[in-house]
């Protein structure tokens, strides 16, 4: 078993034991609170110094505690909740405030015949208007449903908008409904990417910070979150290995007590809550004092509904009291997760392999609600912060490991000259190996000590105690001598709490000592006031006091890396002393500092040689005469020439003839002290690769120098670009337009995919299909980041969550116009399970007005330039831009005459017209407004996808019908076709609420098509008929279902035109087909809108059905 594996196993065992113990303590605290409520004595209950085994808590109590946390059946009152069965969308649970929030409670006393609008078994689609219901039905069939959040739903009774936030549980689909503020423009699932833009500037500032300073990064984050959300206090909590938390950054109002530096017990954030933070990255409490709302569920369900994933889940009473005690009413918490080992199962996401590093916590002194889009933006910002933290943590670990290895190497070198005394008498010494307050060597009844250590007598007592109580041949490690049972721990005091002791022979020991953690912790909020009443209440100050009492006799834990270093040094010393037992200790005088530095340098040089030999790029070195004296494994692999065969050969014999002069010039310049970068050379292939083409390398040179800084030779660090060169050269010969490049089956074409401005994939070429194993039809019209590239077991599965976050950052930057993505390295899994690494380049696509319309992406495998493809793409985009320029020109030129017509109509309106003249003027106004509406329609894709919002207002049906008929009169006269209007006075005189201009557009287009395809024979007639059915909604409201029938003689519309009307748009669609297709899509946007085309032997007809509220 490797050291890493053993380290992981030991950590996992230790962490799992800690988590299990902590859950028991959490359950006991919960039980105490439930029993005593407001008389709860926090300080007495948090006595965690007792072993967890002494907490005699039955398993049923723990189960009850966990169920209360996750299945409490209470929500916050700022929203309402509905749970539906996914199979039929029938309601199986709902919160008691749902009917009130959705406006379903009648204002008058209901009669016996009236049924309640919401009960168990109600079809949820009956509660909302049709566009939202369609989105809800689509969501049910969606895999990762959270990608679609939020869905905008409008109440059927009041048209009030809500954000629907969906997630799945075992029983069905949970719909959290949050009201949309009147001054807020609702976003849709397709617009979720836009909410990222709220945090775009904050993300840019965060990424621009210099690396190597984690506290600077945390300080920047709290300021950015504070500006985004407006909370009174924003903090970054970091969880330590023992589970306790620390406030490491804070931004708060000047009049508030600072919490920066506060340490609090692990029980302040229970393990169950940490588990929920891994599932739900954002948690908002609007008002901790608000009375929670109960959830009613179907009695046939076997257990209470799980609310663990709900954004509305009510805070537990214990947490609400804690918030109240510290003067906080509202909070917003975001989890920070990073990559980690599998050591902490409770705080680890089993799907992503990430664990909970800490939290970003916002507090406010008054109730505060943050809408979903802003919460989503904050979540994204926190994800970016997590990526940065992950980098900083990894860098810190590598730096620590490097420092330990360097110190260990020097200590080992000392052992060969002065074993073992040199490691405590020279510099560096064993105190430099790991962080400690003191260290000691007890060897052959003599003691050498450094820093803060026990006395020699106390050291001997410690040795006797370790041998007696913890016998073995390895040693003993503890962070608390007091808790480990050392009888004289109190005598040693808080200066010596933690100890690492290892055997180097039968009675010889190495010691490292650490003082109490409490000595290292300072919090500005800590104070000692006899009148302080926080001592027994749940409050940060009492929590800090409890924590300080817990760590009074504890040191910082010894981490696995430190123990690996200590155990490695132990083994080395044991080995060096095996032959020395019979010899006396000889204290060799200190060597000259220069000799010592040379020895240290030798150790480092040996390590560098190993790193060079195992590097993933070809590296070779030559002496001043050009003879090879270094040839690493990668160079041997790419050329086929073994190391022993390359050493001693002139470099000119190994390179192609056309590269000899280049190499000689580089060598000459290097010997003069000038180093080259990015030079291209070609090396011959040998052995099995002899028949292959030469190896193409892009190399940098660096000089090899001696102790006096004289140049001895040159080192060439190369990058193998043979594949890229071959692909680029072949590809430069490919001719053709953009479509041929996109869909050519040639392997020379790079993988290409395209998204629109909402992040939805619109293209996926053959090369991308082959590279990923996923067909085009499986990804087009799906969200690229989350549905195509995922961290789950479908689509192109990415390596980890960080990769997905980096891609989101990059795409957000491209779409917001900040910068393009240039050769971003990322990897994903092929459908067959193989892992693929590639370089991603992405460029924004814009329309004629400079607005970003999407992103063009192509992969380089392995990193070819493919300049020709980009040129072809630019030509194609230029052609499209020219066409859009013409269209924009026409739109612009029409606007001025349209404004003039509007001005003249306003003048006529105030000039004393007769009633007939006013009616004609009103008809012309409606026609002009309809024209302006059509001209402004630039988002055909939005109409196609059903994302266009209707512009609703009160209107008269008679006026709209007259405007429709007037639009078709000229064509009617031209083709000698009569129009028969059949709509009763009581129908035409109706006042309705809806989008009258869209209704005019629909009716005029279908009426024109009917006349256009009626034979031009005198006497033929097109019938325009309107049928109304009025339905009462409660006592006061009514709605009318309108049926428009446009009947025209056979043969009617051509079959091809009917197909174009109902089928998706495709290349080559006729103008008439486009008009009817858009009309059919607009009908679907109307309330319960449907359009059918009926064909009989003698007659054909358009039948249009829709509903309007009746004023």
Curated annotation (Swiss-Prot):
Keywords: Chromophore, Photoreceptor protein, Receptor, Repeat, Sensory transduction, Transcription, Transcription regulation. It comes from Arabidopsis thaliana. Residues 213-393 form the GAF domain. Homodimer. Belongs to the phytochrome family. Residues 604-674, 737-808 form the PAS domain. NCBIfam families: sensory_box. GO terms for molecular function: photoreceptor activity; protein homodimerization activity. Phytochromobilin binds at residue 318. Regulatory photoreceptor which exists in two forms that are reversibly interconvertible by light: the Pr form that absorbs maximally in the red region of the spectrum and the Pfr form that absorbs maximally in the far-red region. Photoconversion of Pr to Pfr induces an array of morphogenic responses, whereas reconversion of Pfr to Pr cancels the induction of those responses. Pfr controls the expression of a number of nuclear genes including those encoding the small subunit of ribulose-bisphosphate carboxylase, chlorophyll A/B binding protein, protochlorophyllide reductase, rRNA, etc. Contains one covalently linked phytochromobilin chromophore. This is Phytochrome C. GO terms for biological process: detection of visible light; red, far-red light phototransduction; regulation of DNA-templated transcription; response to blue light. Residues 889-1111 form the Histidine kinase domain. It holds the Pfam family GAF.
